Curated annotation (Swiss-Prot):
GO terms for cellular component: cytosolic large ribosomal subunit; nucleus. Keywords: Cytoplasm, Nucleus, Ribonucleoprotein, Ribosomal protein, RNA-binding, rRNA-binding. Pfam families: Ribosomal_L18_c, Ribosomal_L5e. The keyword Ligase does not apply. PANTHER family: LARGE RIBOSOMAL SUBUNIT PROTEIN UL18 (PTHR23410:SF12), RIBOSOMAL PROTEIN L5-RELATED (PTHR23410). It is found in: Cytoplasm; Nucleus. This is Large ribosomal subunit protein uL18.
Length: 306
């Protein structure tokens, strides 16, 4: 096969077609999105739901989304920053927090659809593979497909922690154990799954082990790195109880607490307007008579000076 150099002449630029904006920005993988969004033609107006998981530097975001012609519609959303209300006040980006966020999303969605009592899911997290569709239910469970975006998924990724939490919460998300922590392949290409290793990740045992190691090896670094834990009185022995109680609290009340509405406040002081959020400047529009009077005052002032 010969190498052909691309000649970027006038014809090349006339026929050049740019990619979609979000593809140019590296935000959307349209190859994967097309397969996640496309619905079977014999299902007509039935939406196809996606479990969207996104990881940032400070939080884990989980959403149940369906696509329409006018744009995506979010049916339920959960954020790891909400875990503060359920007892998890630190470590909001680790694997255990991702599991709690997925569990919160599942229980919140099923409560909204009034299916929370019908699809309880797995109450005790033990790391074992669980599919809600295998239970004896009167109706089919809520099904969603995992959407990881442009992230390169690897075994043990936090995305699959959110997936496990959503499945244990009662959602039907097709998956296998091959990407969970504890899955390994030997030299003969035979895979084995250690559910106990996955359970340790769900309850933050890996964080507790590192806390114990750092406390013995480098106490100064331990106090610096886990200062937020120490302020709350948390140590390596209390982490598992914290996450276990968070799972119970999420199941008791997964609904997002509403904030009280702030009273509107609009007070004008000259050209400054004071509101409940702050203040800003808005000049008052003067009338025609006021403008003429101001012109007369300027003329009289100039006459007096001359």
């Amino acid at each position: 096969m010969t190498f052909l150099r691309v000649v970027k002449n006038k014809a090349y630029f006339r026929r050049f077609q740019v990619k979609f904006r979000r593809r140019r920005e590296g935000k959307t993988d349209y190859y994967a999105r097309r397969r996640l969004v496309a619905q079977d033609k014999n299902k007509y107006d039935s939406p196809k739901y996606r479990l969207v998981v996104r990881l940032t530097n400070k939080r884990v975001i989980c959403q149940i989304v369906s696509s329409t012609l006018v744009g995506d519609k979010v049916h339920a959303s959960a954020d790891s920053s909400e875990l503060v209300h359920y007892g998890v006040k630190v470590g909001l980006t680790n694997y255990a927090a991702a599991y709690c966020t997925g569990l919160l999303l599942a229980r919140r969605l099923l409560t909204k659809l009034k299916l929370d009592s019908q699809f309880v899911g797995k109450v005790e997290a033990d790391g074992e593979l669980y599919h809600v569709e295998e239970d004896d239910n009167e109706r089919r469970p809520f099904k969603a497909l995992l959407d990881v975006g442009i992230k390169n998924v690897t075994t043990g990724n936090r995305v699959f922690g959110a997936l496990k939490g959503a499945c244990d919460g009662g959602l039907h998300v097709p998956h296998s154990e091959k990407r969970f922590p504890g899955y390994s392949v030997d030299d003969e290409n035979n895979g084995t799954y250690d559910a106990q290793a996955h359970r340790d990740r769900i309850f933050g045992t890996h964080v507790a082990n590192y806390m114990e190691y750092l406390k013995e090896e480098d106490p100064e670094k331990y106090k610096k790195q886990f200062s937020a834990y120490l302020k709350l009185g948390l140590d390596s022995e209390s982490l598992e109880d914290m996450y276990a109680s968070a799972h119970e609290n999420i199941r008791k009340n997964p609904v997002l607490p509403t904030k009280p509405k702030r009273k509107l406040k609009h007070v004008r002081e000259g050209s400054k307007v004071l509101t409940s959020k702050g203040s800003y400047v808005r000049n008052v529009k003067i009338t025609k008579a006021q403008r003429r009077e101001r012109v007369k005052q300027k003329i009289s002032l100039l006459v007096n000076e001359s």
